Amino acid sequence: MNLTLDHTTLHRAAKYFMDSGKAASHEAAMNLLQQFGLTIYVGEEIRSSAAHQIALLTIVNVTRRTLLGGVEVIGLPDCDSLTALAPNTGLKEAVMALGGTPVAVARPEWPTALIGSVEDYSNKDTAWRVTWEGWRAGAAPLMIGDRLSEDNSMALAPALAAAVCAGEVFSHYAGDHPMAGRRTAGLSLWQPGADWLDVDESEPELAFLPSNLWIIGLGNLGQAFAWLLALMPYETPQELQLVLQDYDRIAPSNDSTSLLSYKHDTNKMKARVVADWLDKRGFTTFIEERRFGPWTKRHADEPGVALCGVDNALARSALDQAGFPLIVEAGLGGGPQAFRSLGIHTFPSSRTAAEIWAKQVALADTSTEDMPAYQALKKSGIDACGLTQLASRTVGVPFVGLIAACLAMSELLRRLHGGKAFEFIAGSTATLQDIEFGTLHAPPYAHGYTRAMPMGWPTAP
């Protein structure tokens, strides 16, 4: 189905090539994305390891939204899906439902990602290993050879590894980082800023999980939060009480950025789509379909921890006025130079939310209307209002949102396990080795928790 180009249908990764001048038209930008593809090889571990399945399903879900040439999987056996990401189905069916294609032969021109023990694979010159251990995860080029133990001790790690690999593949295709495909890239969620390849004996095995959360905003970040919650080893998913707050509807463009959005859900309320997805995985959800702002007040019986993923400075500046004892906010950059940027803030902190964001409320975004792609649209007859709306949309890719969501979610898990509390974390997926942060003293986590299944993983409800 061909959709009229407007701000609701614009592919947000295509916008990067339009805004940067790499593509002279929207059609040229889409043609570029349609040349991007990925071959994923899976090892024998995929049959019995939920961690490896999480890595596979995550990288398929993330990359198929930006690599429009296709995502193909080699070595996929007939076996059950072991996680709540794809309940009551086979793994092949789960991969296909997310947009991947099981194949027997690789396309030689596509780069390669390896998950598990794979010995025979194509395109060894442009290939990454998706790897993790404990709270650390990333992607390592095969030419370098680094590999971690790929254990089951921390549920977020394989998802983080998949997202990092997706980012490296995109940079390889975009040609905007000379080291993409020639460097390792990763993060420690226990010690942000530490070398992710170094063994860290202080990392605990995941033992506790939050039991009450309020998610504000259900776009790119909010849907990434939901995806990660489904990875968590809740013995009884119903123990997690979730308030889901968003007033917006799904647009076709959300398919390019948000992990639970599909074009067939266009015009459905985001909160209802996300709630339905979580309900099917056994969680308990409550919907709040109104804007967040200074008028929002939490009741004492409602979740005391808020995960915020809105991109609105006015809403952000009111975060600490709603009565939440703990808030973890995640934000993303938006322009062609900043779309890989991410930031995490927690409250209470040394600054109020208004001090951080009030000045951004009235700031105007830098215009890209003079770039060739927008001038081509102007010549094609698009009106001035439509052109301004298109130019004002942010560049967006799902792997940045998922990495930011991993950092936000790990803030809760770290505090639950007696680790450091961070006031802010800032960085870019292009330079994960240069994460900046500030720590603070925080009281013990007292906002509701449940025990994780020991060395376990979620199973389909």
From Swiss-Prot:
Uppermost EC category: ligase
Annotated EC: 6.2.1.-
Result of changing residue 385 to A: No longer resistant to SECphi27, does not form a covalent linkage with BilA
Residues at the catalytic site: 385 (glycyl thioester intermediate)
GO biological process: defense response to virus; protein modification by small protein conjugation
Keywords: Antiviral defense, Ligase, Thioester bond, Ubl conjugation pathway
Protein's name in the database: Bacterial E1-like protein BilD
Organism of origin: Collimonas sp. (strain OK412)
